[in-house]
């Protein structure tokens, strides 16, 4: 009993990491600064800044030193103008958010059982392990999105936006934005929480069933 409660106390740290990671995941989904395009003199639009997100794009035109015009337009998975990497990343981020939410629910259930003394080490279903697997899967989904976005920016891939936005296919220069960094941190924390849940479970199992030396 005491061993299980001590194990649960250690898992609280993993739960906190997973919670922050899940919050960062959902935050990165709503941010538009996944890719930052810098547009200089162009026939389609005046000099400005274009921020490309996973679900919308925003165009910023500087009218003066203190004023700027912002135009944002949302797009969906079925938008034919979207490249494959953005369409796949939309699904990966949604899956990561759902898996992270399920992982949090599983660890809450596990902590409740541990503190009530009804969690068994030899149970067929261990919510600690389930939470670790879910968080690892969530972290992998986010990591794939991050790597793919980074590759697209470094390779200077273009995007065919609707003509109404008057955005060129490729900018003069482009770079990764703040949403990329938020997603990187989210992926790290989700993976870390998954490792914490799984590794501590295995270390607890070793303590419960120690190896005995031959006499």
Predicted features, each with a name:
Residues 41-44, 122-125, 158-161:
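Short amphipathic alpha-helical segments embedded in low-complexity Lys/Glu-rich regions
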Residues 1-8, 49, 73-91, 122-125, ...:
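Juxtamembrane membrane-interface segments at transmembrane-helix boundaries in membrane proteins
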Residues 44, 117-120, 168:
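Short helix-coil transition/hinge motifs at the ends and kinks of transmembrane helices
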Residues 68-82, 156, 192-204:
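Alpha-helical membrane-embedding segments
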Residues 2-35, 86-153, 183-204:
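Signature of small four-pass
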Residues 67-72, 113, 154-165:
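Peri-membrane helix termini and adjoining interfacial loops of integral membrane proteins
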Residues 32-90:
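A surface-exposed beta-alpha-beta supersecondary segment
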Residues 48, 203-215:
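Intrinsically disordered cytoplasmic terminal tails of membrane proteins
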């Amino acid at each position: 009993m005491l061993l299980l409660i001590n194990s649960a106390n250690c898992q609280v740290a993993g739960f906190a990491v997973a919670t922050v990671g899940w919050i960062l995941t959902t935050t990165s989904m709503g941010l538009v600064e996944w890719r930052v395009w810098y547009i200089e003199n162009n026939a389609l639009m005046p000099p400005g800044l274009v921020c490309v997100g996973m679900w919308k794009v925003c165009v910023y035109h500087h009218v003066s030193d203190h004023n700027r015009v912002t135009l944002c337009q949302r797009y969906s998975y079925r938008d034919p103008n979207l490249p494959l990497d953005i369409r796949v990343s939309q699904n990966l981020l949604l899956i990561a958010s759902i898996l992270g939410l399920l992982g949090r629910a599983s660890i809450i259930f596990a902590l409740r059982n541990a503190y009530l003394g009804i969690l068994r080490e030899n149970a067929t279903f261990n919510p600690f392990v389930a939470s670790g697997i879910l968080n690892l899967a969530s972290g992998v989904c986010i990591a794939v999105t991050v790597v793919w976005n980074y590759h697209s920016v470094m390779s200077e891939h273009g995007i065919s936006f609707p003509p109404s936005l008057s955005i060129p296919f490729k900018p003069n220069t482009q770079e990764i934005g703040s949403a990329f960094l938020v997603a990187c941190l989210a992926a790290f924390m989700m993976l870390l929480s998954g490792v914490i849940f799984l590794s501590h479970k295995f270390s607890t199992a070793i303590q419960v069933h120690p190896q005995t030396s031959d006499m």
